[in-house]
């Protein structure tokens, strides 16, 4: 399996999307699609971990597939807005490390 950085994935998706005349959807359309994909992931989580089981004949989808769909649209949104996901995620991880440094009970080191 080939492992790619967030930057490489963003570049690959950008090349793919820009291969079409239409290019990226407008921001509000991408936001609506993010919401749609999050709803589909939520439904699968309910089927796997919740009380709501699939109806007979309902399509089987995996949490991995639905997470991938959501992430693809998120990358499209980030690309369309010129956002580096590596930079954004690095910044937020550092924010959480500082903000929540003493918020949770730490596991004892072995």
Predicted regions and their residues:
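Flexible "arm" and connector segments at domain edges
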Residues: 1-67, 71-110
